[in-house]
Amino acid sequence: MNIFLSLEGRWPKANLYSQFCYDILYDILPDEDRDVFVDIKLTHHADQQAAGYCRGDDDEVYIQIARNSCDVAYTHDELARNLAHELIHAYQFITNSPKSETEAYGKENILTEKYWGK
């Protein structure tokens, strides 16, 4: 799979987050000969104080990650975990898999421990 990743917003340690995303996506996505686009935007906050949102289809996914919730900033580790969670949803869109919060919550810590700060 050819992954085209775009990080928008004021990311702290942008290179680390970018590599983290690539590491996860290359781990979880199937080895197919096609292009996918993953656009990730870091915002001050998200609707309903959520940590993030993901939407898209099998070719392009849009992820929003919040820096804060209820006016409290997420730590770098929390941002990474939230990003891992939304990348599981990206996988679900790209592979046309069922959209499952259970899967995302079940894998977010495993992927964060495997790839964050390695």
Task: Please place each PLM-identified region on the residue numbering.
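Post-HExxH zinc-binding segment in Zn-dependent metallohydrolases
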Residues: 95-118
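Amphipathic alpha-helical segments in well-ordered regions
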Residues: 24, 86-87, 111
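Conserved acidic
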Residues: 13, 75, 79, 96
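Short alpha-helical catalytic segment bearing the HExxH-like zincin motif
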Residues: 78-86
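Active-site scaffold of zinc-dependent metalloenzymes
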Residues: 43-77, 90-93
